[in-house]
Regions:
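C-terminal motif of bacterial Sec signal peptides marking the signal peptidase cleavage site
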Residues: 24-25
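Bacterial Sec signal peptide processing site at the extreme N-terminus
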Residues: 29-34
Length: 329
């Protein structure tokens, strides 16, 4: 059964119990002595301290795989219930989020466009559009994810090298037997050119080789990540298919029975191997504001907050890999 919202990320509501004990006063009319009064509740040091109202919270956009983080941010920054925050988050996906933010929206707009992006890297054609428009954006890396490859659990192949993956997607390796599997054709799924995962696929794998990439027919290039996962699982009831996604999405947001992740160069993707970058196909994701966002604007406050201890705890709480903090010299 599909699991559109993982229990490990979306249902991590920090349900803090403030047991306020109401003491019934005696009929003597005397006040409680300090010794008789209940001890004051001491907030947990890790409990987020809200600093914006729900109405003040900046409008967000970004990548599909960042939706759980956006919801956790909104809950922590405003104090609203996490489940309620989840229902308020929608995104236009990676490429469109960058285009809309860089080309159309303004930092001083009261009612149009996003004010803050939480997003994966932009496709090259979008970077070119932003450069041509001289878009003034400020961005910083706030976490790390990875490009991962998905196969049917019945496929005996456990690991592929980066070069084997390049050869598969260039059409030079066409049978699983050539990489230690059975004598069956390899059916290699991709994503559309405007997707965040396709951008990482080209940057981290294809462009580090000879750049050769076979064109994928429409039926092998689903429009969304969920469609790709479904297609790999359901393709011809066989173990021939391979595809890719970002680790967080497949691990936390859209898991599906019958699939598993391949190791790459012998390293299995996971939070630990992504954190220390021993898994070879890692990349960062970003927070982005307009460069002219005022210091006291809600979007700038949230952007800066992501660098604080509370902000990093928020990222971790949502299940993402945070970046190591380098001490200042």
């Amino acid at each position: 059964m599909k699991e559109m919202i993982s229990r490990r990320s979306f249902l991590r509501v920090m349900g803090l119990s403030f047991g306020a004990a109401m003491l019934t006063a005696c009929n003597t009319g005397t006040a409680d002595s300090p010794a008789d009064s209940p001890a004051a509740s001491v907030p947990d040091a890790d409990t987020p301290v809200p600093f914006l109202t729900e109405d003040e919270f900046p409008r967000l956009d970004g990548s599909t795989a960042c939706i759980p983080l956006m919801a956790q941010m909104k809950a922590d920054v405003t104090g609203m219930d996490l489940l309620e925050a989840q229902t308020s988050i929608t995104v236009s996906t990676t490429a469109y989020a960058w285009e809309n933010f860089g080309l159309w929206s303004r930092s001083d707009s009261e009612d149009y466009g996003a004010q803050l992006l939480i997003v994966y890297e932009a496709p090259e054609y979008v970077k070119e559009e932003l450069a041509e428009a001289d878009a003034k954006l400020e961005q910083k890396a706030i976490g790390r994810d990875a490009l991962v490859f998905i196969v049917n659990e019945e496929n005996p192949v456990q690991s592929l090298t980066q070069q084997q993956l390049r050869d598969i997607y260039a059409g030079r390796i066409t049978s699983w037997k050539d990489v230690g599997g059975v004598d069956s054709p390899i059916v290699a799924f991709q994503r559309g050119v405007d997707s965040g995962s396709q951008t990482l696929f080209k940057k981290l794998l294809i462009d580090k080789g000879d750049g050769q990439l076979m064109a994928a027919p429409t039926e092998l290039a689903p429009a969304d990540m969920g469609g790709l996962v479904d297609s790999i699982a359901e393709y011809n009831n066989s173990a021939n298919a391979i595809g890719f996604s970002v680790y967080y999405y497949i691990d936390q947001m859209y898991s599906k029975p019958g699939l598993r992740l391949l190791a790459v160069d012998g390293v299995t993707p996971g939070n630990d191997t992504i954190a220390d970058e021993s898994y070879p196909l890692c990349n960062e994701f970003y927070a982005v504001v307009h460069a002219d966002a005022a210091p006291d604007s809600p979007q700038r406050k949230v952007y800066d907050w992501l660098d604080t201890d509370e902000g990093r705890r928020c990222i971790e709480k949502a299940g993402y890999v945070t970046l190591s903090v380098t001490p200042q010299a």
